[in-house]
Amino acid sequence: ANLAEMTNLSIPVPPGFTITTEVCNYYYDSDLNLPEDLDVQVNNALKQIEAILEKSFGDSDNPLLFSVRSGARESMPGMMETVLNIGLTSKTIPGLIAKTGNKRFVHDAYRRLIMMYADVVIEKAAGIDPKDGKGIRHQLEEILDSYKEKKGYSEDMDLSGDDWKTVSDKFKIRIKDQLDEEFPDDPYDQLWGGIKAVFKSWNGKRAINYRRFENIPDEWGTAVNVQAMVFGNTSKNSATGVAFTRNPATGENNFYGEWLQNAQGEDVVAGIRTPNPLNESTKTDSNKDDLSLESFLPEVYKQLNEVRTKLEQHYTDMQDIEFTIEEGRLWMLQT
């Protein structure tokens, strides 16, 4: 709903569509089956987005990628699942490399898809309990760590496109060995796997416990937001960030947040790299020498600041926002 509202406020939001909570309830009432006409509706929505962005889902030359996220009525931080980069396959990878001229970025995006998909769709949604408490994501991270050690790399940034390709291949072998399922190479299989996994996450253990604690009714269900991917990691002029429309600790009217150059959304919150301050006024002694978004991309920062004002006026409350900058173009992902 917030994404749709931002669109109505003429705030730049990547195009997408929502599968409603009614479908979630139908799914649980119908023995985990989706309504018969849903695939026609989804395909029509995909076509509309393809027309807006002039890209095609599953296309070998100019592929469109999607994220699948939950859209619960009440925010349930970290409880519900997300899968990014859906649509990367052996057929679309070469096209995206040709399009972006960035082999490293594409293979990095692909290994992220594999990690998230294995964790969210193949393991958690299927209700598989990890052996020795080590889930598939943990195992894949161990594979990556040992690969870096072998190569003498200290950070993810050190890996080349070929490195990420090798790591992805190792990931797929481990997934097959551990979970007895192939990582799907068809974009539609990936998409529907992601959609069903979000619905299933509504009844995951963590989500149920959280609802009990917060008094959120089970029958609300979750919606699924399917949204075109925009990338904060295609170039130096790309970035990703999170912000509060004012200081969350004091409520002071200061635009407050963090951003990472040439990074994808989850990097900011994952703690893998140290984010930079959003602007000059909120710098502290510890980050006073770091590059702020305000000084690096002043036009984009100005636009972001205008969005912040619009959102506060509209919602009459402090907002917590996520944004991505793709090749110098601002996109709002969440408020």
Please tell me what each predicted stretch does.
Residues A1-T335:
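Nucleotide/phosphate-binding sheet-loop regions of phosphoryl- and nucleotidyl-transfer enzymes
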